[in-house]
């Protein structure tokens, strides 16, 4: 009986091995994101998460295909780096969902002549995407540990057109302004006046605004000194904090 049972087990295992290529399309390892190289995962991310949702700007798509997102997350999350979700990067902060990075970049309508200010450096990933498209990027991070880590990583990756500052993003970076575009990756309860003042004529700002659970991604355009506002989509970002530890 034992010999018969072992024979049956072997036959079942053999049958599973024979059927696997048909059940999983013949290339189960190649098509399963878990077994793919980072390059293939990145291409899959752009194709299924970004292009499939209507992002068409060629400069944005090219940047997303080039920048290695897995290098901007802790090692334990690298295999999930190209998934359709944010990931923790330490200090209670996250790297944004790839689609949101793409959307926020696209609505700014950037090119190689633009000077951009980013509020909330975080991992440095968004700054890298911007640097692939724009002339220069100034980015501010409140949390020193994150800012210094991002600055080193960006330098190691060869980005020479990114300036990193540790400071209060609400105040912007007046010395380097005005900016053709401003991108804010943390949510204040209102639009900071210093950032509006540092936006160049004709410039655009994309910013999540609202309280913890009710935020709207807003696109602002400065025209003849006045700010025009357009709602984009509901979002959820970490709150914009000041040096005193209080949310704006």
Enumerate the predicted regions with their spans.
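Alpha-helical interaction segments
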Residues: 12-14, 72, 169
